[in-house]
Structures are given as C-alpha cells and as structure tokens.
From Swiss-Prot:
It catalyses: RNA(n) + a ribonucleoside 5'-triphosphate = RNA(n+1) + diphosphate. Required for late and very late gene expression. May be a component of the novel RNA polymerase activity induced by baculovirus infection. GO terms for cellular component: DNA-directed RNA polymerase complex. It comes from Orgyia pseudotsugata multicapsid polyhedrosis virus. The lineage of its organism: Viruses, Viruses incertae sedis, Naldaviricetes, Lefavirales, Baculoviridae. This is Probable DNA-directed RNA polymerase subunit beta. One of its GO terms (molecular function) is DNA binding.
Length: 884
C-alpha cells in the first residue's frame, strides 16, 4: 500500500523548494486568481497548473497534474467536503473531464544483476548494465552491458556502440570511468574511488560479484521493480524541462557573477521577456500523461515497439485507469499493472511463490488482462529512492568502525566480506563477524536497504522501484535487539537470505500473520468483519466476490441523498447500509415454487432500496460562421412539470429546450437518443432539442435539466435525466460469499418474523448454498417462526443471517455497448459470458464427446471398432467417459 497523496505532496514541495524555487499557480497569465470550484474545473476539463519562477516566467506551462486531496489541491480548489467524502476522490486526477488514476507499474529489474539468455551466449548467463558516460548536452546516461558466463568464467561486454567483445584487463580503465560517475547515485560516488592496485583488479572484482548464484528467474518478484506514479512524474518533469532549466539558470548566475567580479555593467540592451519558456516541452509532458505513457521515462523499449508495430494496439499503450465515482476506498495507490512485451504467454503472467504477502492472493483483475493487474498487500511498501540517506548510513558504518577501505584484493583477510553496492564493486570491506551489527545499523527504522551475502561478498542494494514488506526482526548476539524493518522479496522468501541464515546474521523474522496478510487494504476495508471467509470457502468464490465488488453500483445513504452520481446508483435506508458498495439484508435459505432455480433470489416486496439512473447526454453542434462576426446565441431551457411525454413504444420524450442562433448550426447526432427540430425565424435559426429515455416499471422522474456551453465554434447542449424506481426485478446481486444471482419476483416475507420484529428480506436457494460450499460462521443470526408466533413451542425455528450484498444493473444501453459494438475475434474474454471461442470449444467437446465416440464406434455396423474411433479415443488427454 502506498499513499499517492503523500507522494505528490512531496513532489510539489520539491518543485517549490531550492534549487527549483518554482511557484505553482492555476493560470500563469493570472497568478493571483482565487480557487475554482469543481464545476468550473470540470468545464476546463483538465485539472493542471503552471510553475512560475521568481521572474514570473512560466517554466512548466499547464503540465503539472494536480492530484485531488493534496495540499496543492486545497490551495487551488474551493472546498467541497461533502462531495469529496461521498466520492472518495483522494489520489485521483482529472484529464479530458474524466477522473483517472495511474497504477503502480511493475517491470523487470534492470538496475541489478539478473539472469540472462541470448542466442549469442550460453544458456545460463548473468547480465548487468553499468551506467555512466553521461552526455550533459543531450541528457543521455549511456550504459555498457556486461554478460558473465559462469561455466567458462568469461566476461563479455557490449559497449555503447553495440560492439561485442570478450573482456580483458584492458577494460579496467573503462570500468573505472563508468563506476566512478554513474550519474544515478551521485551522493555515493565516493564509494567508487579505488586505489591504484584496486583499479587494475576491477574486472576480477566484477567477475567475483557476478559469480554469485541467483536463485530466482526473471518472472519472480525478487527480479521486479514497481514504479510509483509520483516518481515517474518527477522523472518526466526533470528530464523534459527542469534539467535544462537548472543548467541555464546556473549559466546565467555564473555569467552575472563574472561580470560583477570584472566590474562590467550588465548589457543595457534588454530582450523581450518570454512568458512561457518551454511551450513545446510542456505540451510533450501533457501528451505523455494523457496517453498514459509515463513509463517511457525509464524504458525506451516500449516507444521502439510502438514505432515498429504501429497497427498493434497492445494493452500497455495507455496505463491510465478511468474511474467512475465514487472510487473504491484504498484502490488508488494499491493497484499494480504488470508491463509485458508483445509475445505474452500465459506462463509469463502467473504469479511465482515470492509474490505471496507482497501481491494480493485473491484479486487478480479483469479476465481480459488476467495476471496483469493486481493489488499490493496491506503490509507491502514502495519506498522512495533516497541515495543521500544511504550515504549517511555508510558514514554511520564508518563512524562505528564496521567497514574498512580496500586497497588490494590480494591482501583481504579470510574473514572479510567485500561490500558491493547495487552489484557494483566498492572500495569498502567488512568483517563477517560484524554482519549482525551492520544489519542493525542499515535495516532499523524501516530503512529501505536490501542486504544479501555470499561466501566473500556483502551486497547492499538501494534503487528505484523497490518493493518491501513491513516486518519485525529479532537480532541476536552481539546486538540483542528487535527492529522494525522493510524486507524485500529476496530477504523474506528465499532460504539463502541473510534473514534465514541465523549463523551469519543472527536474525529471525517475528511472524504473527493470519489470512489478512494475503489481502490488500481495499479487501480488508470492505470485508472487515468477514475475513474468515477467505480461508473457509473456495478461493474462486472469493475472487468472484471481489471482481463484483469493483463493478457494483455505488450505495448512498437515502436520508442524506443530494444529487445522485452519474450512472447507476442505489439509495438505501440507514439500517441496511454497510459501506459505499454493500448493503446488509436478512437472508433466509428457502425456495418457493422453484423460483430460486438457476440462482435467482426472492426479495421482499418492500426492501428499503431505490435504484437511481443519472443519465447525461451531450449533443454537439458546429456553428457555420461567415467571417469573424460573433453570432448571437441563446439557450432557453424548458421548465415545469409538463416537459416530457410517454410515447406508445414505452419511451419518454423530454423537451430539453430551444437554441436560438444567428448562424446555422450543424448538429452531430444519430437520431436515437435525441432529436433536433430546426426552423428559421427571420434572421435567426431556431432549434428545438428533444431527448429520449426508456420507461421502466414504477419509474419516477426525479429531475430534468439542460444547459448549453460554447467553446469557439462548438456548441454543446448538455442534458441530465435522473430517474428512480423501487422495482428490483432483474437486478443482479452478489453476496460476500461469491453467490451470484438475479432478483426474481418479490414476495411478502414478513411472515418469517423474529421475536424482535425483524423479518427475512431475501431468500437464497438451498441448492446454491450447498453447491457453493458457503458457510454462515460468525455471521449475525436470528431465528424466525413462520407466522411470527414465538409462543408456540412446537413451531419450527429457522435461522436468518445478516449478509452483505452488492447490486448491479444492466440497462439496454450497457448491453448494447458491451456486446453489439465489439468485433469478436475469438481471442478476447468478456467477463461473465460464454462468447469467446475457447469456451465454445470446451463446451462443445465436453457435451458431445461421449455421443460422438459412440456414434463412431457403431457407425460402421461391424462388430469391431472402426479406425476413426481408435484414432479419436487415442487423442483424448483427459476424459471422464468410461468406455466398455
């Protein structure tokens, strides 16, 4: 779990502090303007701000994304506490009028050494990139690639010009250059200043480091890094604008000082001040954010792939996630997307053993991207990269005499461990006996530094994208202390880890976990009192419940209901409200006239639930302007109770209003959702706008509203229709047990009455209850008697259970969008359907196998089996048919 708001608060503070000293304002042309309300921000469509320097030049022009809930948001937006609390906006941002979140992104770890296979080399090699050779002009940090073949003990190198060669001692000088100025961890450059003898031994030192066995494959979490949104945003701003701006500001300052020293007056000729310094670069930043391609800051591979395959629309092209309000609590910041290349195979996407307790074990995202979207467990942490902090830690080790300098590898003591930082050779060593003390100094206070050890090397790692888990560690003699530590997947899961080798580190992880350690904070919040279900009922049912939780209609409190959110929502009574996605209903396991066959539920005829549908339509038109004359334009919205009428086909026609225009308007619409009647009145064009919506049983029209906006020559008429109904028949429900079904015809369930007056509110199928292996342990229960006569001792008592449910609704529009507007290729998987080719084939084979074989066997009317039967029966890998 990571806090997006805290991360972005830190980013904004960094922009406003030295050396940048920028001032964040909503508009660079009006920096003193007051805060805007949310409606005005939605009209602007994008919630971004500008960054001004002390000369009031705009350095970052409308490209700094403002995240809702941050201190900057509180400064730029008028307070709307009720709306924020109801919709849980915290951590989201707005672009193109849509609320979006950016997931944490998982990639392969190219910072450290990793297993590597290439046709040019042996099958089991190790690879490492050495960064350096920084080109300050082009802001490029080049890298040479080192590949080590353990079998032959040979080191190969590929330089920045893509030339391959076997490494000899001649490379020592080049290695020193790359290691001494990596450009990535400048506060630690002093670790890579070697003695004269050591400089001649760097190749051997690197071979020693790369000879160490890595016991994880490329798909393991130990070989992954997870980038946070704020870090990628900072990289984008720095690489695109800030790096160049700082360099130019430094040059100007140096020139000013030189002129002052020489006594020369500054040039009298003044150039015209430029208000926006980096217009094109700012536009590039906005495009990167809008297209969800922040990951390109750290990986150029994806941009190359897109250029190579322009027609291929992969799932990685846009990582922004559009979020419908209200947002699931604790979703933002916990969600992780795994980036994969074009040749995605199912085995690449499965989770390895070291994902446990770091990545949620129950929520695996949508079927379309199975294995690529998941959630961080509650105890997982994504720490910030801080090389200055690591430099302070090394200074602390030197202060306590726990490390010593290396002058010559040949003169190192037998009990000494050479220290490597991020798998690079350093000029330090330590004693093996001091490892427990070093662990204490480097790991305490949840310091995000990874420690590994081999027979002669202590690996100290700290880099971007680390993923850790918060644990308590007990360190024995000579330290004898317990510390709060952050452990990486390697440290926590692998038997070769220091924390599973007490003879070396004297460490022991203190464990007190239950099933909640496998769950994200989102799951723990929504299933707070029902976590026991995760280990008492089948896991697939819990996955169903979690998937449906994400897709469920928002649940609102009826007593304080203001404007219903856009789309479908549910308003409920206070006594059945559980959270913003669930309602609690008293459930009785029974059937009536087979009404619960095929999974339907029987609801009570008067449930305290009302469905709301807030439908927004935008009718767009273009003014046919002649010259630069501004046309007269006016919109008169209709009012009163008689502005809608029911048509014979059960549709409702709503008269939205009249547009009066001095110029002709060309409207873009299909005539299905809305209708425009046009006529002329003298020099004016008159357009009457009508909107259609579907009529349902017991429907009440809550509100009808219309408005018009003008942007350039574009006219937009926006209509909002809010309807509600208490008819729940056909609404899909899902319980916390993963029991899906639809609501059937309602019955009067007040005859099933408890002593305190509580009655059953919904009936669950007895067959479904048994077949799904559900249980009602630890659920609130009461006992009811049919008819409510509890004085009768012979009357049978039946238990009812207070079970949370999620509700869904499919309108004809949603069904049309989901099914009819898609081109099926046979490769996609639409959740909850059987439309894909794989499922069709499985179903056909399963249902037809037995009769097909029987038909083949008897088809020839001969006593012996025909050849076709023999062939087909031999091809069956798995079959549940008994052949006699």
């Amino acid at each position: 779990m990571t806090d997006v708001v805290r991360d972005f608060d830190a980013l904004y503070a960094k922009l406003e502090a030295p050396p940048h000293n920028l001032r964040l304002v909503l508009e660079c042309c009006a920096p003193e303007s007051g805060p805007l309300d949310l409606a005005a921000i939605q009209e602007r469509k994008s919630y971004t701000c500008c960054a001004l320097n002390n000369r009031r030049n705009c350095v970052l022009h409308k490209c700094v994304v403002v995240v809702f809930g941050t201190a900057l948001d509180a400064r730029l937006r008028a307070p709307s506490a009720e709306f924020d609390a109801q919709n849980n906006l915290r951590g989201t941002f707005m672009l193109d009028g849509r609320f979006l979140s950016f997931p944490n992104i998982m990639m392969n770890n190219n910072v450290l050494m990793h297993n590597f296979y290439d046709k040019l080399y042996a099958k089991h090699c190790k690879r490492m990139f050495l960064y350096g050779n920084v080109d300050a002009e082009k802001h490029i940090n080049r890298a040479i690639q080192l590949v080590y073949d353990k079998a032959t003990r040979r080191l190969f190198a590929r330089d920045v010009y893509a030339s391959d060669y076997v490494v000899t001692d001649d490379l020592n000088a080049v290695l020193e250059t790359y290691l001494a100025s990596s450009g990535k961890w400048r506060p630690l450059d002093h670790l890579f200043r070697y003695s004269k003898a050591h400089k001649q031994q760097l190749v051997d030192h690197i071979k020693m480091i790369m000879h160490h066995d890595i016991c994880y494959s490329i798909d393991n979490l130990a070989n992954k890094i997870i980038y946070k949104h704020a870090y990628l945003m900072e990289l984008l701003l720095t690489s695109t604008v800030l790096q160049h701006y700082q360099k130019r500001a430094g040059e100007n300052e140096a020139l000013k000082r030189r002129l002052e020293c020489e006594g020369e007056p500054p040039a009298s000729k003044r150039r015209k001040a430029q208000s926006v310094l980096y217009g094109k670069e700012s536009k590039k930043i906005v495009d990167s954010v809008v297209n969800g391609r922040l990951i390109y800051c750290v990986s150029k591979t994806f941009s190359k792939q897109r250029r190579s395959f322009p027609n291929q629309h992969d799932n990685c092209s846009n990582n922004n996630i559009e979020i419908s309000l209200p947002v699931l609590k604790y979703r933002v910041g916990s969600e992780v997307t795994r980036i994969t290349n074009d040749s995605v195979r199912q085995k690449m996407l499965k989770q390895k053993k070291d994902f446990v307790k770091f990545i949620g074990s129950f929520f695996h995202g949508e079927m379309t991207v199975a294995g690529k979207k998941f959630f961080l467990c509650r105890n997982a942490r994504l720490p910030n990269v801080d090389y200055a902090m690591v430099a302070d830690k090394f200074a602390e080790l030197q202060q306590f005499g726990l490390v010593a300098p290396v002058h010559d590898l040949a003169h190192c003591a037998d009990g000494a461990l050479l220290i490597a930082f991020n798998d690079r050779p350093t000029n330090l060593q330590c004693a093996r006996a001091d490892v427990p003390k070093i662990v204490y100094r480097l790991k305490r206070d949840r310091c995000p530094i990874e420690l590994k050890a081999s027979s002669n090397i202590l690996y100290v790692n700290h880099h971007e994208g680390m993923v850790c888990i918060a644990k308590r560690v007990r360190i024995g003699a000579p330290v004898n202390a317990s510390i709060n530590a952050l452990l990486t997947p390697y440290e926590y899961h692998y038997k070769n880890s220091l924390f599973h080798a007490p003879t070396v580190s004297a460490c022991e992880i203190e464990e007190s976990d239950d099933v909640r350690c496998l769950m994200s904070k989102l799951e723990q919040y929504y299933f707070a009192e029902y976590t026991h279900l995760f280990y008492t009922i089948p896991v697939p049912k819990m996955i169903v419940a979690l998937t449906n939780l994400k897709n469920a209609m928002p649940v609102l409190r009826y007593s304080t209901l203001g404007t219903a959110p856009v789309g479908l929502s549910v308003a409920v009574g206070d006594h059945v409200l559980m959270n913003n996605k669930m309602v609690k209903l008293w459930t009785l396991v029974r059937d009536s006239k087979l009404m619960t066959a095929e999974d339907p539920y029987i609801p009570h005829m008067a449930l305290p639930i009302r469905l709301y549908n807030h439908k927004v339509n935008k009718l767009k038109g273009k003014l046919a302007l002649a010259g630069k004359a501004v046309p007269t334009l006016k919109f008169v919205a209709s009012s009163g109770p008689h502005n809608c009428v029911v048509l014979p086909d059960n549709m409702v026609q709503y008269f939205a209003g009249t547009v009066l225009s001095g110029a002709k308007i060309v409207w873009a619409h299909d005539g299905k959702r809305c209708m425009v009647e046009a006529c002329t009145n003298g020099a004016h064009n008159v357009y009457k706008v009508y909107v259609f919506f579907r009529r349902t049983r017991n429907q009440a029209v809550e509100s009808l509203a219309a408005s018009m906006t003008l942007a350039g020559d574009a006219v937009i008429v926006r209509t909002a229709v809010v309807t509600s109904t208490d008819d729940l028949e056909g609404v899909k429900v899902c319980s916390v047990h993963g029991q899906k079904g639809v609501l059937n015809r309602s019955e009067d369930l007040t005859e099933w009455m408890a002593e305190d007056g509580t009655h059953a509110q919904i009936c669950l199928s007895p067959v479904s209850y048994l077949s799904r292996q559900s249980n009602f342990e630890r659920l609130e229960r009461k006992y009811v008697v049919r008819g409510g006569n509890h004085a009768d001792p012979r009357a049978r008592r039946y238990p009812i259970f207070n079970i949370p449910y999620m509700l869904f609704n499919n309108t004809p529009d949603n069904i049309y969008k989901e099914f009819n507007k898609k081109n099926y290729t046979g490769h996609e998987k639409v959740e909850g359907t059987r439309f894909d080719q794989w499922t069709k084939n499985q179903s056909f084979v399963g249902n037809r196998l037995a009769e097909s074989l029987q038909w083949m066997r008897g088809g020839s009317n001969l006593p012996q089996n025909c050849g076709e039967f023999e062939v087909v029966s031999s091809l069956l890998m798995c079959n549940n048919v008994v052949m006699k």
